[in-house]
Amino acid sequence: TKVQSGSGYHLDDYLAFVLKFHNNLFDKATMDENANYLETSADTIDDNLESVSINSGREAVSFGNMEVKQETKPRITLQEMNNTYTVIRVNTILSTEISDGVIQYYDLSETYKLRYTADRMYLLDYERTMDAYYNESIIDSANNLISLGIQNEKNISYIYSDKGYRVCFAVEGQLWYYDYQSSDMYKIYSLASENISDIRNATGNHGIKLLSMDDKGNIFYLVYGYINRGRHEGMNGIQVMKYDAKTNCNEEISFLSTSLPYDSMKEDLEKFSYLNSKSVFYCILEGDLHEIDLEKKKDKILESGLVNESLTASKDQSIIAIEKEQNLYKNKQIEMIDLESGKKQNFTTGSDKRIRAVGFLSNDFIYGEANAVNVSKSSNGTVSFPITKIH
């Protein structure tokens, strides 16, 4: 949250425009007003409803032939505001009847980039995503087909085992498990309540990351971000979870509390998080490198005080290199750790030299060496590191 003092931002005008544009989406008669702001490209595809932009056609922007209605009031978030433009996000949950008595729910997220002038409002950019909550009533077990409906592929994750006879997938804050042999579908975990229109479902600042699945269907996974229900409701952090397929029960292995916002947690987990073959999980949270033994349920901090770019990982993230000095321009030691074998290797240099990680070529570590007198840090924090030798 950022508190900003000022005047002349025309926030009331921005909000009025956004709400009017948003409400016009659900009324074909008023959609003409919205169409005037679109910049439809010649090659637009009007049946692409999962991802819509200012370059999309009128049909796609107004949901094509779908008859949708809002299940929740629009939830408005002010993302950016200055004297030049303002960015506003709108989230809501929609529904449509896909067959007699079968209701499908969707999470809708819109982003508006606007500029105000005394003459008119300019829509500089518009992006919208639409993702379906999984509906188990439309599974085609006879053909072993699971339809996820309207989805953005980047928001779907899945793992499978037992030659594909067991599959687990995460979509819209829900974790589902399907056993092909028994044709059974289970909702393992859900950040959304059974009442989809519950306002807590529309926060959008939490996620699920799948770690592993064995041939018995047991699953390790993470729930991270703002926890909106359960015993950690209202807290921010990472839950390390285990699902037992035999008992159909979830168990919390560990909970790592943090003040980091969801976007930062997601970025850190995408940058580095690794589960080795011995069910030991590694991740970085607020500068601490955690080693969590999922079987023994033990959490150990291997390193503290890590700063941006002080950890470098191989492509498969099984090997990491850590610069031991927080101040890069003072660093004289790098420790490399193989997270599968646990083996460590140290690289050092003389007192008149400095070293820093360059990266990995496959699993081969590369680092650079520079003369200490030539390494400097500017007033804006940028480090100049003229490498004289590559190792």
Residue ranges and their predicted role:
Residues T1-N65, S141-D184, L191-S193, S197-H206, ...:
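Core segments of small alpha/beta cavity-forming domains
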Residues S56-V102, H206-D215:
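Surface-exposed, charged secondary-structure patches
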Residues T84-E127, Y133:
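Exposed beta-sheet edge and beta->alpha loop/turn motif
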Residues Y105-T111, H206, N331, K353-R354:
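Short, surface-exposed coil-to-beta transition loops
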Residues Y106-L108, F169-A170, E233-G237, T382-I387:
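Short coil-to-beta strand junction motifs in C2/discoidin
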Residues K113, Y177-D179, V240-K242, E291-D293, ...:
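Conserved blade-register residue in beta-propeller folds
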Residues M185, C249-I253, K297-K300, G342-K344:
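Predominantly a core beta-strand signature of beta-propeller blades
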Residues N327-D338, K343-S379, V383-H391:
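Extended, charge-rich low-complexity regions and/or helical-solenoid scaffolds
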